[in-house]
Structures are given as C-alpha cells and as structure tokens.
C-alpha cells in the first residue's frame, strides 16, 4: 500500500510507515502523476484536491487533511469517486487562540492599554472561535459572538449581528471558513464598506482565511492612518503577498497562527487514527506521546498573578513579534511564504508549561487558559 504524505506534516512519516510505503512530497506542487498507484493521500491546506489532481488517481481510496479547514478539498468529487475523506477539526484551535492573545497583549504593551478593558468580537463560533471565547471567559474579558449559521441551527449561545459586533467590539477576530455561496458567504465579508465604518481605536485580526478580508480595501483603510490597527496571518492571494500592505500592518505572519507543535501533532494523529479505523487496524496514536519537553517546562509563582505576570507568561510561550520580524525580513525572497511555514520553529502551547504555586496564587484562571497547574 502506497501512502503519499505532505513532506511538511510533522510525525507523519514515522506514523504512516507503520501502515505502508510512505512517499513524502511538497504539498503545494503535487501533480496528477504523483497520485498514480497511490492508495491514500495525506495533505495540508496548501494542496488543492480537485478533478485535475485526481485525474490519474487510479487506486486512491482515502484522503485525509491534517487541518481544521476543508475549503481546499472538493468533497463532492471525492464522494462521487468513492474516496473516503477525513479532516482534523479543531486541531489548531488552541494555537490560533494563543496567537490572537499574543497579538493583543503585545499591542496593549506597545500602545498603553489593558486587554481587560477591551471587548472582543469573535466572528465565527466554530471550534477556533469557541475556544478563543473559552480563553476570554477564563480571564473575565467580555466578548460578542457572530455566527448566523450556528444561530440558525439553534445554537443557544447569545449571538449578535455582524454590524452590531463591528460597532461594539474593540478587538475583531475572524474565525470563519471561506465560502462564496449560500445565505452567508464569507468572501470579502470584511470589505470596503465595513472597513470604512471601523473606528480609529479598533483592532482587526484575520487568522482565518485570506479572502475573508478584502486586502486592497484594508490597505486603503490603513492608509488613512487614524490609529486603526490590523493583524494578518492570512493573505488574500497567498503565498503571494502585497508588499505595499506590510508596512501598514501591526503584525504579519505566513499563515502560522495554528502552527503550534501540539496542534500539528493533533492534526497528524487525528487523520492517522481515522485511517487506521478505515483499514480496520488497531493502531492508534496519542499526540502527547510524540511531543518533546518544552524548552522552559516549569514556572514557579510566589504570589497572586497580575496583568504583568499574565503578559510575561503568554509571551514566554509565544511572542508574535518573533514571527513578524522573520516574515518582514524574508518575504521578498522567492518561495519565502512556503519556506517559512516549512521551516517553522517548534512553537509550543500553554499546556507545555507547568505553573507551580500555592492556593494564594489564584491559579484557576491560568488552568482554564490552558496552562498545566501544580498546586503546592
């Protein structure tokens, strides 16, 4: 059995080699010829699964994407061909939420405001948006939710309209898929008209899909230079990036918000376990068994944590300025966007750090935020 994997999928080679012959290739440059005699295909979001790619897939029976998003896969086509499909919903939710928190924490430090004085607006209440809301709940930070599809489906959470969210939120965080059809398309959801309504003191963060925000309109909005801030982890035409947009952004990164090592391990193991079930094999993988010890695995608190402590803990795990600096330095070189993703460092999640302290340190919110807690 031949299993074709994306060469940038962590732990995939060692796991899938238990099941068959593994062939590793660049996901963005896969061609139809690569799928000849291949039984299973394991991809990431850079691979477009369409009729062209599958035109010579004479043995393909299984496709797995180690990503939460699925807009790069023509699922109807796979179904018509009798090919089983699976994804990894929620695998990156922790990393994306921690990315957003890092961005806002750094901006708070740079511009002299407190994250606790802000209201967040979360657009898209799926796995990622819901986890971000959970983090904000842990810190008692208010937020508004917008997700008309969830609302129509009977989700009992309190939702507001998009226009109300844009009006009342200080930090607007996007967590929708990219859709062009249906009652609530998200392509250019944040376009020129809505961008011009945003206040000078608002922050827009897109860690969802690039085309959810009209990048040309965003550039024009930022050129007003009234204090409005924007952070992009995704770009409308990535891997191509509008270089003229970069100086206007507070932070810019190459689609790595969900690239924590834990998240990537979860994505790989989720599709590995699904493939084992498909094959009726007993093998199962636990992402925790794959992860190395964090560079700084332990932190001790001697007193009640405060805003400064929280800022330091969050930046200890992940400081967005590191990725932003690399992005701005490298992006003008050929292939930089994909190379930065391919060579991305082993970023960890809060759970990789154990915080030790006594009951007077008030550790419960930190535990709810995701840190591992050891009370003494």
Curated annotation (Swiss-Prot):
Keyword flag Chaperone: no
Pfam families noted in UniProt: 2-Hacid_dh, 2-Hacid_dh_C, DUF3410
Pathway stated in the Swiss-Prot or TrEMBL entry: Cofactor biosynthesis; pyridoxine 5'-phosphate biosynthesis; pyridoxine 5'-phosphate from D-erythrose 4-phosphate: step 2/5
Catalytic reactions on record: 4-phospho-D-erythronate + NAD(+) = (R)-3-hydroxy-2-oxo-4-phosphooxybutanoate + NADH + H(+)
Alphabetical UniProt keywords: Cytoplasm, NAD, Oxidoreductase, Pyridoxine biosynthesis
Residues at the active site: 209, 238, 255
GO biological process: pyridoxine biosynthetic process
EC number, as in UniProt: 1.1.1.290
Main location (coarse class): cytoplasm
PROSITE patterns on file: D_2_HYDROXYACID_DH_3
InterPro entries: D-isomer_2-hydroxyacid_DH, D-isomer_2_OHA_DH_cat_dom, D-isomer_DH_CS, D-isomer_DH_NAD-bd, Erythronate-4-P_DHase, Erythronate-4-P_DHase_dimer, NAD(P)-bd_dom_sf, PdxB_dimer_sf
GO molecular function: 4-phosphoerythronate dehydrogenase activity; glyoxylate reductase (NADPH) activity; hydroxypyruvate reductase [NAD(P)H] activity; NAD binding; protein dimerization activity
GO cellular component term, pick one: cytosol
HAMAP family (alphabetical): PdxB (MF_01825)
Subunit structure: Homodimer.
Family stated for the protein in its record: Belongs to the D-isomer specific 2-hydroxyacid dehydrogenase family. PdxB subfamily.
Function according to Swiss-Prot or TrEMBL: Catalyzes the oxidation of erythronate-4-phosphate to 3-hydroxy-2-oxo-4-phosphonooxybutanoate.
Protein name listed in UniProt: Erythronate-4-phosphate dehydrogenase
Species this chain originates from: Aliivibrio salmonicida (strain LFI1238)
């Amino acid at each position: 059995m031949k299993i074709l994997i994306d060469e940038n999928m962590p732990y995939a080679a060692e796991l899938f080699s238990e099941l068959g012959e593994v062939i590793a290739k660049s996901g963005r440059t896969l061609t139809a010829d690569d799928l000849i005699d291949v039984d299973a295909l394991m991809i990431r979001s850079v691979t477009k699964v369409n009729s062209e790619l599958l035109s010579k897939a004479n043995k393909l029976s299984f496709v797995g994407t180690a990503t939460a998003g699925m807009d790069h896969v023509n699922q109807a086509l796979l179904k018509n061909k009798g090919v089983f499909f699976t994804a990894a919903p929620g695998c990156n939710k922790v990393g994306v939420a921690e990315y957003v928190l890092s961005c806002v924490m750094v901006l708070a430090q740079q511009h002299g405001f407190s994250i606790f004085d802000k209201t967040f607006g979360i657009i898209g209440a799926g796995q990622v948006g819901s986890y971000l809301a959970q983090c904000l709940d842990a810190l008692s930070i208010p937020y508004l939710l917008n997700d008309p599809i969830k609302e129509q489906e009977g989700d009992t959470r309190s939702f507001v309209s998009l226009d109300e969210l844009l009006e009342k939120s200080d930090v607007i965080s996007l967590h929708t898929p990219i859709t062009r059809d249906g009652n609530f398309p998200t392509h250019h959801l944040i376009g020129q008209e809505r961008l011009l309504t945003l206040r000078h003191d608002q922050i827009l963060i897109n860690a969802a899909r690039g085309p959810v925000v009209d990048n040309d309109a965003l550039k024009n909005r930022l050129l007003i230079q009234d204090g409005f801030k924007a952070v992009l982890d995704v770009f409308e035409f990535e891997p191509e990036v509008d270089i003229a947009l970069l100086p206007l952004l507070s932070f810019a990164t190459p689609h790595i918000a969900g690239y924590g090592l834990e998240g990537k391990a979860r994505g790989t193991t989720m599709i590995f376990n699904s493939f084992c079930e498909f094959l009726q094999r007993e093998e199962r993988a636990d992402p925790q068994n794959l992860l190395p010890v964090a560079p700084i695995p332990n932190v001790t608190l001697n007193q009640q944590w405060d805003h400064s402590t929280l800022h330091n803990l969050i930046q200890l795990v992940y400081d967005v300025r590191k990725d932003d600096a690399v992005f701005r330095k490298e992006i003008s070189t050929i292939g930089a966007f994909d190379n930065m993703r391919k060579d991305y460092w082993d970023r960890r999640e809060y759970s990789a750090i154990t915080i030790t302290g006594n009951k007077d340190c008030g550790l419960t919110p930190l535990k709810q935020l995701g840190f591992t807690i050891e009370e003494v």
